[in-house]
């Protein structure tokens, strides 16, 4: 999906669910990591996370677009556009837009595991973060630690 297709999709969703046109720019922002999309208050543009489209498809993207359009139309009309505002929550329910998007699964962060073993008592420590073996010792016997397995 390219920039023109996403612009067309946002305009169609705006007319279909809100009955009002979307008169600004919609685009993908590949730098977004943890959020599905964002509405920019100063320019009234909408930025969407391309990775959500890759992972979950068009249906999830339409939900994110509806959520951001709720911010857009409420802000344009001068009503409460923030997540905590009653107007925003009511409009979300009316257009069946999700309040939160699905959780982004980051495979590379979950896989990395370090296994350390004490050289004296052979106690094993499983860690997600790497530790400095010159600085840290075994908590049981104060023996030296050795990295035995690193999975990534």
From Swiss-Prot:
The keyword Repressor does not apply. Keywords: Cytoplasm, Metal-binding, Zinc. It comes from the Bacteria. One of its GO terms (biological process) is response to stress. Its cofactor is Zn(2+). One of its GO terms (cellular component) is cytoplasm. The active site is at residue 68. It is found in: Cytoplasm. Residues 7-148 form the SprT-like domain. Belongs to the SprT family. NCBIfam families: PRK04351.1. This is Protein SprT-like. It comes from Bacillus cereus (strain 03BB102).
